[in-house]
């Protein structure tokens, strides 16, 4: 006796079924599922204070420039206490060599 009935495309090979159900669609009812959808995080930027940084060794003219000027130098070239050219200090940050003031 053959293990498969003539309805091979509809029915897998197995024992002979009690009812001929080759033309009936296979319907399977599953239990309801619950899916939780998490929202993606949102980045909020609040306005805050604007902080500016300045080089620590930048000197702005003041009444103490005569006392401090003798200890300041730009790449080994001393800065005179009687006033100096700012290009000497600023050129240090631009990659060019400082010239004597």
UniProtKB/Swiss-Prot annotation:
InterPro entries per UniProt: Keratin
GO cellular component, one term: intermediate filament
Pfam family, one: Keratin
Protein family membership: Belongs to the avian keratin family.
Protein name: Feather keratin Cos1-2
Quaternary structure annotation from Swiss-Prot or TrEMBL: The avian keratins (F-ker, S-ker, C-ker and B-ker) are a complex mixture of very similar polypeptides.
Organism: Columba livia (Rock dove)
Gene Ontology molecular function terms on file: structural constituent of cytoskeleton
Domain of life assignment: Eukaryota
Keywords for the protein's UniProt record, in alphabetical order: Acetylation, Keratin
Modified residues (N-acetylserine): 2
């Amino acid at each position: 006796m053959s293990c498969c009935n003539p309805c091979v495309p509809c029915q897998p090979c197995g024992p002979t079924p009690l009812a001929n159900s080759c033309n009936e669609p296979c319907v399977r009812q599953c239990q309801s599922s619950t899916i939780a959808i998490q929202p993606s995080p949102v980045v909020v930027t609040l306005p805050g204070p604007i902080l500016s940084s300045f080089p620590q060794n930048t000197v702005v003219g003041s009444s103490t420039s005569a006392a401090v000027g003798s200890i300041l130098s730009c790449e080994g070239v001393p800065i005179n206490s009687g006033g100096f050219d700012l290009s000497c200090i600023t050129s240090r940050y631009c990659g060019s060599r400082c010239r004597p003031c």
